[in-house]
């Protein structure tokens, strides 16, 4: 299956562990994880929304379906905090940008604190004039998620190490002679 092969190629050696982690999280938090009910396939350069039950298909699945987009947008509107990392679909193709644009609009309309992460997301939020309605916009997608998860970021670690190393020299009184 085309979409399965795409995931295997993207995740490489991490494919099986990622699938197992996803299954475990879904089992542990079934009321917190919303899976799509439909997806948009690119069939002969046309958007065709397909129910999950109609899968698999030998066509790229490159956006959320309309029903899933509505469900995600509704969930966003009642959220207290939103962390979004990356577009929902292949937004460069107008027919497959619907999920992304609607989700960004829902984030902007929500009263929640919204963190937008990733270069594509930051570009789109700016393009559609939504940046001022978000709590934070960062071009660092994976780095933003790592920071939120409490992981050490190499750049921050280097700055902290540098501050420790040079703090003594910076704060020493200078001898006027």
Please place each PLM-identified region on the residue numbering.
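Active-site loop-to-helix "anion-binding N-cap" substructures in soluble metabolic enzymes
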Residues: 1-177
